[in-house]
Regions:
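Iron-associated oxidoreductase/ferritin-like identity signal
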Residues: 1-148
Length: 148
């Protein structure tokens, strides 16, 4: 196992998850309209989840003898705050995190069971989140998955 590449990937995951915390917090502040309360609650839950994911990645970094990053992943302010725009941006962000977890899995497969199980668990969580957002982007009665 290339420990330095694993540490770099874990730090990138941590940065992406922390960017998600900022992103979801911002989105929660920008929701207006009749459905504001449940949507804000959902966005705040995602911010809390992102912080937990960042902490988990950071713990792995330190367990491996590395130094957790103070950086943040990319933050794109589109100035679009329609719920549909927020969900599409969320889907894109989650896809980037999912790719990073798959990259980690490829690096540690059959070399470190703890990191492999961590990566698999996070992949399952990210896929479930993408599926949830995908359903939210569908029109009422639409059963086919949303495609951009």
């Amino acid at each position: 196992m290339d420990k330095q590449t694993v540490l770099t990937t874990l730090n990138r995951i941590m940065e992406l998850e922390l960017a998600g915390v900022v992103r979801y917090t911002h989105y929660a502040l920008m929701v207006y309209g009749y459905n504001r309360i449940p949507i804000v609650g959902w966005l705040e839950k995602n911010a809390e989840e992102g912080l937990a994911h960042a902490r988990a990645a950071g713990e792995l970094v330190t367990w491996l003898g590395g130094h957790p990053s103070l950086g943040l992943g990319p933050l794109l302010e589109s100035h679009k705050h329609d719920i549909g725009d927020i969900l599409r941006e969320s889907l894109e962000h989650e896809g980037e995190a999912l790719r990073a977890y798959y990259e980690l899995l490829d690096l540690v497969r059959e070399q470190d069971v703890r990191l492999e199980e961590y990566a698999r668990d996070m992949i399952a969580q990210e896929i479930a989140h993408q599926d949830e957002v995908n359903k939210m982007l569908r029109r009422p009665g639409q059963t086919e998955p949303y495609t951009s």
